[in-house]
C-alpha cells in the first residue's frame, strides 16, 4: 500500500525482511550482488518452516517470507523454548531475532538491517554522513550498532532505547514516527533551519 501511495516519494532502494531482502525501489527487482550473497546462506523458507514445526506455540506471521520465517510469540511462551529454538536455527546455519516482545524472526546468518544497509552504502559509495537511520523496535538495533547516525523515534520499544543509550551517534526523539525523524533532521543539522521541509505542518 505504501508503494502505491502517490503522496509518498518512491525510494530508490528498499531494504526489507529485517535486512534479508534488498531491491531496486522502482522495479522491485533484487539488487545484485547483495541479494545473491544473502541467498547463498539461506536454506530456504520451507526447510526452516519444517524445522520450526515442532514448536507449536509459535504463530506464523501472515506476511511474505521468502528469505525469513517470522512468527508471533509472547515472552512467557518463548522463555522455555528459546534455547531449543536457537539451537534448531543454529543447526540450519540461521540466526534468531526477537523484538517488541512479539516478533520472532529466523534469518539468514549474519543478516540484519545494519549489515545490509552498510553493504548497500558501500555499493553505492555513499558517505556515512549522508545516511540517517530511524527505528522503533529492537530489530532496528543493528542499524545503530553499524555506526550510522540515527534516531530512535518517540514511543520506541524500551529495549531499543536502553540498548542505544550509550551510542554516540544515536539520538532519542520525543515525537513518534515521522515527527521523530523531522526532529532528528533538525538535531543533526541535515537541512537549513529555514527549509520548509523541516517543520511538520500543524492542523
Positions of predicted regions on the chain:
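Active-site phosphate-binding/coordination module
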Residues: 1-61, 155
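Mg2+-dependent phosphoryl-transfer enzymes with acidic/Ser/Thr/Gly-rich catalytic loops
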Residues: 107, 114-203
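Conserved beta-strand termini and adjacent loop/short-helix elements that scaffold enzyme active sites
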Residues: 17, 99-101, 175
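Conserved acidic, metal-coordinating active-site core of Asp-based
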Residues: 45-146
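Short, charged/polar "capping" segments at the starts of alpha-helices
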Residues: 1, 78-79, 158-161
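Short, structured coil segments at secondary-structure junctions
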Residues: 7-10, 18, 92, 146-147, ...
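Short amphipathic alpha-helical segments
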Residues: 3-7, 27-28, 83, 145-146, ...
Amino acid at each position: 500500500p505504501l508503494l502505491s501511495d502517490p503522496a509518498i516519494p518512491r525510494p530508490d532502494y528498499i531494504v526489507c525482511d529485517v535486512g534479508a531482502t534488498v531491491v531496486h525501489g522502482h522495479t522491485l527487482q533484487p539488487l545484485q550482488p547483495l541479494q545473491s550473497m544473502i541467498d547463498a546462506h539461506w536454506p530456504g523458507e520451507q526447510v526452516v518452516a519444517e524445522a520450526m514445526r515442532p514448536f507449536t506455540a509459535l504463530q506464523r506471521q501472515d506476511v511474505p517470507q521468502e528469505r525469513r520465517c517470522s512468527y508471533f510469540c509472547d515472552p512467557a511462551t518463548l522463555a522455555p523454548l528459546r534455547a531449543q529454538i536457537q539451537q534448531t536455527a543454529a543447526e540450519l546455519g540461521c540466526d534468531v531475532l526477537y523484538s517488541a516482545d512479539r516478533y520472532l524472526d529466523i534469518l539468514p546468518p549474519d543478516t540484519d538491517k545494519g549489515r545490509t544497509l552498510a553493504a548497500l552504502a558501500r555499493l553505492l559509495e555513499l558517505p556515512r554522513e549522508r545516511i540517517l537511520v530511524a527505528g522503533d523496535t529492537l530489530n532496528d538495533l543493528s542499524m545503530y550498532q553499524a555506526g550510522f547516525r540515527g534516531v530512535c523515534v518517540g514511543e520506541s520499544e524500551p529495549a531499543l532505547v536502553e540498548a542505544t543509550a550509550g551510542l554516540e551517534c544515536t539520538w532519542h526523539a520525543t515525537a513518534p514516527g515521522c515527527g521523530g525523524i523531522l526532529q532528528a533532521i533538525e538535531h543533526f543539522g541535515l537541512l537549513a533551519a529555514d527549509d520548509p521541509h523541516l517543520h511538520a505542518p500543524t492542523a
